[in-house]
Curated annotation (Swiss-Prot):
InterPro entries: EF-G-like_DII, IF2_II, IF2_N, P-loop_NTPase, Small_GTP-bd, T_Tr_GTP-bd_dom, TF_IF2_bacterial-like, TIF_IF2. It comes from Chlorobium phaeobacteroides (strain DSM 266 / SMG 266 / 2430). GO terms for molecular function: GTP binding; GTPase activity; translation initiation factor activity. Keywords: Cytoplasm, GTP-binding, Initiation factor, Nucleotide-binding, Protein biosynthesis. Its main location: cytoplasm. It is found in: Cytoplasm. This is Translation initiation factor IF-2. The lineage of its organism: Bacteria, Pseudomonadati, Chlorobiota, Chlorobiia, Chlorobiales. PROSITE patterns: G_TR_2, IF2. Residues 126-220, 325-359 are annotated as: Disordered. One of the essential components for the initiation of protein synthesis. Protects formylmethionyl-tRNA from spontaneous hydrolysis and promotes its binding to the 30S ribosomal subunits. Also involved in the hydrolysis of GTP during the formation of the 70S ribosomal complex. The gene is infB. Residues 634-636 are annotated as: G5. Residues 343-353 have a biased composition (Basic residues).
């Protein structure tokens, strides 16, 4: 049953990828519906999965519905085209059997291939006729169907008389009533652009007769083949015919169509009112179809109207696709007659029927779908937008406050000159010197000022002095990254926690390699930088920091360069001081924390106790309603590791980590660790943060410079370049850089060398002045307080990070009487110079994971120096602490031995007074210190001169015995006095 339940559960992150929505939106939806989930890596059942798909699949439903509407429209158009084709074939058969009227003689015109002349038939025929002739320049008729069948026809008898193309109708045959009399051919001036072919009722008989008379005077019309010679004829007089406005009983239409090529002469159309298949006039069925489609479009648009959509909507909220209006006389296409001739309308005032624009409808459907998607997750998106807006406002306010504060802060290096300070504050050097004179300091323009003087002078000018290092003062300003160069980069994850809580074991399982075996004592003593490929071919860079208290600087440095912190806490232990310190480092750096409760496979594991202690430390996990993700794991068994990786990737997706991957930008990174190799020289572990670091690039790092000679990954495999978030080992430093220094690629070796030399000059000057002052202060302190005991040491280690950790740990071991004085520290093996320096300063040499060379070893034996070697930092700190405790003065304690009562006093010649005593308690020794008490008041403190029983000298007297004694250099003893015997005991002190 348990296996079946597992098969029916789904991970939230997988569902979000399947639906192509944000994991946070899915998480918010589950919580809004009463679901209790901790993070996007949590599992949900089949029922909740159905709810999620029902909510977030609205977009798919709307897209499917839009596709159905589009398919239905295409199907209807296809069916309409098929019906039109069949109707047109039937009409052709009827047209061949129609009555043909006598030919009307017309003067020769400019005629091309097809000539269609339609004239009015006699009243008995009750048919409409239209005379059309195609000009030499072919024009496109507005009569065309969806299948792109085009016919070219136009009436052009003379320049002044122009007729318009026939109107568009549905392919249906309409007959007119018999009461209709002879219609006419209506002509309009050339400037008129509206359709001119329009039938009139029987009241217009006079105009019709006149038109027939004019046509009878024109000569005979003959069909000219395609390539015949055109004959010019005189222009005919224009006979304008104005329509008589009267409401017709039935909508009359003029229909034009092509005459077959095998028919010659003039063709007269019969009485049938046939429909052209390319006519677009509104019929009942087409109107119903358009109305149905319009209602569907309006239903979608009315719910979610956008400002852009409102501008495009016309009348009934359908976009009218207007055709270009051009004069018919210039050979271009005239506007199409989109509506039928129905009702009483004024010429030039006809309103075109709207045509649906499919592109606009598709855009509106997409807008509707987007709106429905927003409404589905409106709560989470609105909350997210509100939070982002508030964050931007806070950032803007903080930036404004920062700019205001910067106006009153001057950033200056220690021991700056008046000239440099004047440039920073925007005043003259003369004013600075005058202020110094007013403060009682006589300085020159290039003289160096100490820290107190700089602070006082800055306050005099209304500034607050902020002291920076020489590296910050000469930092290279990076260019602003282009948005197009910023791409998603792998996250940098730092594993932090207390010692022996399983940080390296966790990384060991992830990397599938035994890292702990390579560390002395089973604890991590370096920052290890590794790049790991996880599920989905995604990369994560891990930094493994030491957990011992001596490596505080390393943990702080790891928190400053990381994106996510994994806080490892042992379930069978508790939240330790280094755990609290790691939490503070992460919070100070603004880095998100993912809690990993390790060792849950042990019997004594108690994860709930760990969560309680974490909440007391300010880390409230998601299971308890907090914001920090938590995962119970076992680094040895691999339990929960996959879920932990999923939470890391989810956190990285939320933060949208990006880096500059441009090929042209100068690379930069941070020094994680440095060491001195005997064969390769200085090797530094660098975490690239921007651009690509390549072999041959000149660079500057701190006070040193160099050129990249080789790049190696964590497995010592040579590579050619390293991108953002990639750790790499770099060879090519001229000197050993410090951990935490920024490595910046320069344009040339010259620029790198100049910047490094400038920093070195400032550093040497600062160290010289600082060391001189320390010596003077040391002399003054020794005069005031007496000589302080100091343990002088020289530290040599394998890496710069280990040196810093050792130095920090040793400097913490001190009190008012003793302390550690580090004379020299460096990376690499112990040399003869180190031995000579130790002999001159009476110091001991501490070698951490390094050994002396042969000459140094012989010299140390000759000088009888104490050289100690260690590989675990515990042992170094313990031995140094014992040595300092041995230098402390011991504590003195008084221990009572016994007491005697003087009961009789004897006077002995040449000796003085001797007391006869009785031992009350304890034991009194001959060499014991004694004090004489009289009435409870001490009157003597010294030693015994003699101690006898009877006439014999004894060494001790026990309680209950009598004895005689005399005090050294004291003779005033009386009966009743009490003699107390005691001794002073020395006790070693602890730091």
């Amino acid at each position: 049953m348990a296996l079946e339940d597992m098969e029916k559960r789904y991970r939230i992150s997988d569902l979000s990828r399947e639906l192509q929505v944000s994991p946070q939106e899915v998480l918010q939806f589950i919580r809004m519906n009463g679901g209790k989930v901790g993070s996007t890596s949590s599992m949900v059942n089949e029922e909740m999965r159905g709810m999620i798909f029902g909510n977030f699949s609205v977009e798919k439903k709307m897209v499917d519905e839009a596709m159905k509407i589009r398919a239905e429209k295409q199907r209807r158009l296809t069916r309409l085209e098929e019906q039109s084709r069949k109707t047109y074939e039937k009409e052709q058969q009827l047209r061949d059997s129609m009555h043909v009227a006598p030919l009307v003689p017309v003067a020769p015109l400019h005629v091309a291939q097809d000539v269609i002349v339609e004239v009015a038939a006699p009243p008995s025929a009750q048919a409409d006729h239209t005379v059309q002739a195609e000009p030499a320049v072919q024009t496109e008729s507005a009569v065309q169907t969806e299948s792109a069948v085009q016919t070219e026809s136009a009436v052009q008898t003379e320049p002044a008389v122009q007729t318009e193309p026939a109107v568009q109708t549905e392919p249906e045959v309409q007959t007119e009533p018999a009461a209709q009399t002879e219609p006419e051919v209506q002509t309009e001036p050339a400037a008129q652009t509206e359709p001119a072919a329009q039938t009139e009722p029987a009241a217009q008989t006079e105009s019709a007769v006149q038109t027939e008379a004019d046509l009878s005077d024109v000569g005979e019309v003959s069909i000219v083949p395609e390539n015949v010679e055109v004959i010019d004829v005189p222009e005919l007089p224009m006979v304008p015919v104005m329509p008589v406005k009267e409401e017709p009983s039935v909508n009359d239409q003029l229909v034009s169509f092509d005459i077959p090529q095998n028919i010659g002469g003039l063709t007269v159309v019969g009485t049938l009112d046939m429909m052209n298949p390319f006519d677009r006039s509104e019929s009942g069925k087409m109107k119903a179809r358009k109305k149905n489609f319009k209602e569907q479009a309006d239903a979608l648009k009315s719910e979610f109207d956008t400002p852009a959509g409102e501008e495009k909507l016309v009348d009934d909220k359908l976009v009218v696709k207007k055709k270009p209006v051009k004069a018919a006389g210039d050979g271009d296409t005239a506007p199409a007659a989109d509506d039928a001739l129905a009702g009483k309308k004024k010429p030039g005032k006809k309103k075109k029927k709207p045509d649906v624009d499919e592109k606009v409808i598709s855009a509106n459907i997409r807008t509707t779908i987007s709106g429905m998607d927003d409404s589905a997750g409106s709560v989470s998106r609105q909350k997210f937008r509100k939070m982002r807006r508030m964050e931007r406002e806070k950032e803007h306010e903080a930036a404004e406050a920062f700019r205001e504060s910067q106006r009153a802060i001057v950033r200056v290096t220690e021991y700056a000159s008046p000239h440099e300070l004047a440039e920073l504050m925007g005043v003259t050097a003369k004013e600075i010197i005058q202020k110094c004179f007013a403060l009682g300091k006589f300085v020159t323009i290039n003289q160096r000022l100490d820290k107190e003087s700089l602070e006082l002078i800055a306050l005099e000018f209304g500034f607050e002095a902020e002291f920076i290092s020489e590296i910050e003062a000469t930092a290279v300003v990076a260019e602003v990254d282009d948005a197009e160069d910023l791409l998603i980069r792998p996250p940098v994850v730092t594993i932090m926690g207390h010692v022996d809580h399983g940080k390296t074991s966790l990384l060991d399982y992830i990397r599938n390699s035994n890292v702990v075996a390579g560390e002395s004592g089973g604890i991590t003593q370096h920052i290890g930088a590794y790049e790991v490929t996880v599920e989905g071919n995604r990369k994560i860079t891990f930094l493994d920091t030491p957990g011992h208290e001596a490596f505080t600087a390393m943990r702080a440095r790891g928190a400053q360069v990381t994106d996510i912190v994994i806080l490892v806490v042992a379930a069978d232990d508790s939240v330790m001081p280094q755990t609290i310190e790691a939490i503070n480092h992460a919070k100070a750096a603004g880095v998100p924390i993912v809690v990993a409760i390790n060792k849950i496979d042990k019997p004594a594991a108690n994860p709930e106790k760990i969560k309680t202690q974490l909440s007391e430390a300010g880390v409230l996990v998601e299971d308890w309603g907090g914001e920090y993700q938590c995962q119970e794991i076992s680094a040895k068994q691999g339990i929960g590791i996959e879920e932990l990786m999923g939470k890391l990737l989810t956190e990285a997706e939320i933060r949208e980590l990006k880096g500059n991957f441009s090929e042209d930008v100068l690379a930069s990174g941070i020094i994680i660790e440095s060491e001195l190799d005997k064969g390769k020289g200085v090797i530094s572990t660098v975490l690239v943060q921007r651009g690509y670091l390549r072999v041959g690039d000149p660079f500057v790092a701190g006070n040193t410079m160099g050129r990249v000679r080789a790049l190696m990954d964590e497995r010592s495999k040579r590579i050619h370049e390293a991108g953002p978030s990639q750790p790499v080992r770099v060879l090519g430093f001229e000197a050993l850089p410090q951990s935490g220094d920024v490595l910046t690629v320069m344009a040339s070796d010259r620029d790198a060398r100049e910047l490094a030399q400038k920093r070195q000059v400032i550093r040497r000057e600062h160290e010289f002045r600082r060391s001189t002052r320390v010596k003077l202060d040391s002399i003054a302190r020794q005069i005031r307080e007496g000589l302080m005991k100091e343990l002088s040491v020289i530290i040599k280690a394998d890496t710069d990070g280990s040196i810093q950790a050792l130095a920090d740990g040793l400097m913490k071991i001190h009190n008012e009487e003793v302390k550690v004085q580090i004379i020299h520290q460096g990376v690499g093996q112990i040399t003869e110079t180190d031995v000579l320096l130790a002999a001159a300063s009476d110091a001991i040499i501490i070698g951490f994971r390094v050994r002396p060379n042969v000459n140094a070893k012989k010299l140390a034996e000759k000088e009888d120096l104490d050289v100690r070697f260690y590989s675990v930092i515990y042992h170094v700190l313990e031995d140094v602490e014992k040595a300092l405790e041995g230098m402390l003065s011991p504590e003195l304690h008084e221990e009572s031995l016994g007491s005697l009562e003087i009961r009789q006093v004897f006077r002995v010649p040449k000796v003085g007074n001797v007391g006869g005593c009785y031992a009350l308690e304890g034991k009194v020794f001959r060499d014991s210190k004694v004090r004489l008490l009289r009435d409870g008041v001490q009157v003597y403190d010294g030693q015994l001169d003699t101690l006898r029983r009877f006439k014999d000298d004894v060494k001790e007297v026990d309680a209950g015995y009598e004895c005689g004694l005399s005090l050294k250099n004291y003779d005033d003893i009386k009966v009743g006095d009490i003699v107390e015997a005691y001794k002073i005991v020395e006790k070693k002190r602890k730091l």
